[in-house]
C-alpha cells in the first residue's frame, strides 16, 4: 500500500485521496477492495 493511501477506518479520506490519485493501480486496487472509492479508469 502506498504511503498516501489512508487507513481503512478513514473512509472519507480514502474517497478523497483515491479520487485524486486514482491513476495509481495500488491505491485503486486498495480502494476497490474496501468499496470506499468509485471504480474509475484512467488512460
Swiss-Prot record:
Residues annotated as transmembrane: 12-28
Subcellular location: Virion; Host membrane
Keywords annotated in UniProt: Host membrane, Membrane, Transmembrane, Transmembrane helix, Virion
Lipid bilayer topology: Single-pass membrane protein
Transmembrane is among the record's keywords: yes
Function according to Swiss-Prot or TrEMBL: May initiate with G7P the virion concomitant assembly-budding process, by interacting with the packaging signal of the viral genome. The assembly-budding takes place at the host inner membrane. In turn, G7P and G9P are present at the end of the filamentous virion that emerges first from the bacterial host.
Chief place of localization: virion
Record-stated family: Belongs to the inovirus G9P protein family.
Protein name in the entry: Tail virion protein G9P
Gene giving rise to this polypeptide: IX
GO cellular component, one term: virion component
Amino acid at each position: 500500500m502506498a504511503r498516501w493511501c489512508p487507513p481503512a477506518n478513514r473512509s472519507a479520506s480514502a474517497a478523497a485521496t483515491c479520487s485524486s490519485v486514482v491513476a495509481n493501480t495500488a491505491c485503486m486496487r486498495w480502494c476497490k477492495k474496501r468499496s470506499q472509492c468509485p471504480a474509475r479508469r484512467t488512460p
